[in-house]
Amino acid sequence: IIALGVLIYVVLDGFDLGIGILFPFIQDQQERDVMMNTVAPVWDGNETWMVLGGAGLFAAFPIVYATVLSALYMPITLMVIALIFRGVAFEFRFKANRTKALWDLAFIGGSTIASFLQGMILGAYIQGLKTENGIYVGGSFDWFTPFSMFTGIGVVVMYAALGCGWLILKTDDGLQEKMYELMPKLIIALFIIFAAVSLYTPYSQPAIA
């Protein structure tokens, strides 16, 4: 159930966050409106799957939940703040006129930062958490490493690719053509990052190799 919840979250909220990451590539306000309208009916429900994964982890493995939360409380807290900030920007952008550009920046920032932090959390988990007798004994910033930053960038690119694919399916004309042009670049970047992470992981974590 935990894995299923996380997987569904990555797929569903991935393209959702990807829309915000792709915003800087689209300058036309009407096209940006179209981008947001494609996810407006579903965006606020996608985070439910992340809650399901967290609740499932707490219910099934409370010790693991406590350890992970102790080790990663800072990036998790910042991620939640970014998601809230993004949600506020999503709602207020539709009602703003003179300040729409500011809410666009907030939407871009919230989406990108939340995605990046999710990747850093993944990277920190892959690298391993220092524990003794089920208690986290590492430092507050052990999660902040070059490897976790690289996985953070990887998740940002992956979500951008998911968002690009979503827009290819849901839009047409000029916006769709722009997404078709952007998709190969995102796929190449994602492949390079995936290859680098795959090569570095066994090197940094012999137990995984």
Regions found by a protein language model. Name each.
Residues 92-209:
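Long, contiguous internal "core" modules enriched in hydrophobic/ aromatic residues
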Residues 12-21, 78-91, 157-167:
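Membrane-water interface of transmembrane alpha-helices
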Residues 30-33, 37, 63-70, 100, ...:
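Membrane-helix interfacial "entry" motifs
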